[in-house]
């Protein structure tokens, strides 16, 4: 009987030990501590993987604050680590977010292709954000990181990030069909401008290369051996509601999800003399923890504490990250 099975390990140890994982998304409602959790997971992965990259797709870019170090759109080594790198992208910026080096080349075609591609993409509603993800994926795959952790924006953006391979595949198909019709005109136009080495094939080669990578990424996203999603929530109604919606959407998209982090919990021992507000919050959290236990009995549910101080800086994150591997137990306070 299923009811007789022991509960799953209340930690992220299963993810850290799963060597086949290539992409790990961490997401949930705003304000639940996603960045702290994703940064802590990246730190633990760095202990067992050759190279780890954490990418922030949230325009707020909180990982710079978390590690107390400025990150950019180029992967940068995190201070205090040899194999942990971080980068921040703004999906709303489209192709302009890409490093300029991506479009460098010996001929004029690559130098003008960025602007031309941006104009072509703007003609397809909804694809701009997806294309920025696509180009980042293309860059990241070329760097061969062992595993990539995504610190995602709140739920709506996250679902678009998950769906971007399908959007890009559909959009690039349209662009390539359009290219077949416009190729003679484009070649004639650039020749008039004196750029003889620019042709439609040069531009479309970028699109062909990207489509090949995105098709591969799309397959990997649907493979539970290579991709999983970690939902972060707090023990409150709206956060739990958002988490359930996210789990359902991820399941619909074919994305594996079997880990939930419940963050910012009060751990009040029997001997703990708490204030009335703390006691009240504790009761509310216990109610929603019971609901989480019922809803997600086949999930690994990790419980993390609400701390007196912010988790900020490499050393602080290293210490806090241990709670992802070993279930947190509060220190008992002596009765007064």
Swiss-Prot record:
Organism: Drosophila virilis
Role according to the record: ATPase required for the post-translational delivery of tail-anchored (TA) proteins to the endoplasmic reticulum. Recognizes and selectively binds the transmembrane domain of TA proteins in the cytosol. This complex then targets to the endoplasmic reticulum by membrane-bound receptors, where the tail-anchored protein is released for insertion. This process is regulated by ATP binding and hydrolysis. ATP binding drives the homodimer towards the closed dimer state, facilitating recognition of newly synthesized TA membrane proteins. ATP hydrolysis is required for insertion.
UniProt keyword annotations, A-Z: ATP-binding, Cytoplasm, Endoplasmic reticulum, Hydrolase, Metal-binding, Nucleotide-binding, Transport, Zinc
Domain of life of the source: Eukaryota
CDD domains referenced in this protein's UniProt entry, alphabetically: ArsA
PANTHER family: ARSENICAL PUMP-DRIVING ATPASE ARSENITE-TRANSLOCATING ATPASE, ATPASE GET3
Gene Ontology CC terms: GET complex
Secreted is among the record's keywords: no
Protein name, per record: ATPase ASNA1 homolog
